[in-house]
Amino acid sequence: MTLPEPLFRMEGISKRYGGAVALKDADIAIRPGAIHAVLGENGAGKSTLIKIMAGVVAPDEGRMLLDGKEIAFASPAAANAAGIVCVFQELSLIPDLSVADNIVISNPPLKFGMIDRRRQRRIAEEALARAGASDIHPSALVKDLPLSRRQMVEIAKALARKPRLMILDEATSALTQSDVEKVFTMLKRLRAEGMALIYISHRMHEIAQLADECTVFRNGRSIESYPAGTKTDQQVVELMIGREYSNVFPPKPAHRGEVMPVLSCRDLSWGDRLSGITFDIRPGEIIGVGGLDGQGQRELLLALFGVLRDVKGEVVIDGRPVTLKSPRDAKSGGISMALIPEDRKTEGLMLPMTVRENLSIAALDRVSRNGVIDRAAERREIDDLFKLLAIKAATIDMPVAALSGGNQQKVVIAKWLMNRPRIILLNDPTRGIDVGTKQEIYLLLRKLADAGAAIIFYSTDYDELIGCCDRVLVMYDGSIIRQLEGAEINEHELIGAALNIAGDHAAQRIAP
């Protein structure tokens, strides 16, 4: 079958930021009626590539062609006018405006010089329906929507612009499984309608399910383009990281013997979201928290960290009952707990501030003397963490917003490690980062556990739970219904427990 000519092509594209090369002689060709996956580690050049496509930044060298004619975009508005629209990983919605206002914000329908509210609502309803999100009310305020629904509004906003080429940058990373399926259905429909689509994701199974063509980027260069399905996952990952990809997860230690738990929960409950949570964790253990998304896993972490009010039940630290009324209590010296949040950009980092400031602010007591920051002590602490986490940054005084997503996530982790926590809570810490950085985080977690930390690790990725965790607590409807250990930690048992289906072992509430 003869392939159609590319709708959009980039040839020899290069971009530098100061002395740093973001793209070097990059090429890519996007065809109509096809989904083109762009793969690469964080920092490989993908974000710069799509920013150039979308008119956010201009290339230093190279050219772009649309319908065979050379073009240049002075702004995102110019790219939109040419039919190129991007759904960025960072949401562009205005929280205090309605869904409908956000969807038409770049080109509101007018009548007698004023916004035509009836037509605006109709446009919003059509865009939401096309995105598979007709359950979202156009009049709802964006700030009242959960993150996954905001992402669906972002996609609807892009569709309302009637693009010829739509770019999706990690568009499913914040979505529920139900919304992911709706997005997949939408993308397949748009492909059948002849739209050109660029799909960026670190989730290999999504690429396998959706893509027609793939291009791999590494260190700012386009390494190889190939038809989807012609390479194994391992071959693709090796193209992305430039080395052999094996031993993704570090080996698990042998049974450590009986050690007194560092943390115990007894019948922890909170409203209708948590019920009867009971478990122990010992120093050196990595305990996974699994189950379908939204079964109380995040609430469990927030309850342990003192964020939630009116939590019932008992938390015991080192055999002594404690009261966790606030994160300050959880972080205190006697408890020494840390929570790595889910959303690094809104909950984990202060993006306009420097890497140094983000790290130091979490541990002022450690790096201060008589109320004044000891710059030498601060530098020693930061240098140690940079080495431990292999953080890539030109300088610690650069804005943290300028780092790649993977390095931003490392800074979030480093920020909490500044206080040397004994108990580490992680809320889906590898969401939206590349496979190489994920592997580094897995190694770090095992290293921290081997040094005596107790780690509670919530993940929506079954492979992570299987590969990283010594035990897995599976949650359903706010309760722990199953504990998996050893050979039981496999995909079949995890899925069965997540769906509350009794497998070889009857589902039961866990008691230590």
Swiss-Prot record:
Stretches of the chain forming a coiled coil according to its record: none
Q: Which UniProt keywords apply?
A: ATP-binding, Cell inner membrane, Cell membrane, Membrane, Nucleotide-binding, Repeat, Sugar transport, Translocase, Transport
**Record's function text:** Part of the ABC transporter complex RbsABC involved in ribose import. Responsible for energy coupling to the transport system.
Query: Which residues are recorded as binding ATP?
Result: 40-47
Entry-linked Gene3D superfamilies? P-loop containing nucleotide triphosphate hydrolases
Enumerate the subcellular locations listed in this protein's record, separating them with semicolons.
Answer: Cell inner membrane
Q: Which organism is it from?
A: Rhizobium johnstonii (strain DSM 114642 / LMG 32736 / 3841) (Rhizobium leguminosarum bv. viciae)
- Tell me its family: Belongs to the ABC transporter superfamily. Ribose importer (TC 3.A.1.2.1) family.
Q: Name one GO cellular component term.
A: plasma membrane
The record's EC number reads 7.5.2.7
Source organism phylogeny: Bacteria, Pseudomonadati, Pseudomonadota, Alphaproteobacteria, Hyphomicrobiales
Q: Which InterPro entries match?
A: AAA+_ATPase, ABC_carbohydrate_import_ATPase, ABC_transporter-like_ATP-bd, ABC_transporter-like_CS, P-loop_NTPase
Q: Which reaction does it catalyse?
A: D-ribose(out) + ATP + H2O = D-ribose(in) + ADP + phosphate + H(+)
Name the chain's protein.
Answer: Ribose import ATP-binding protein RbsA 1
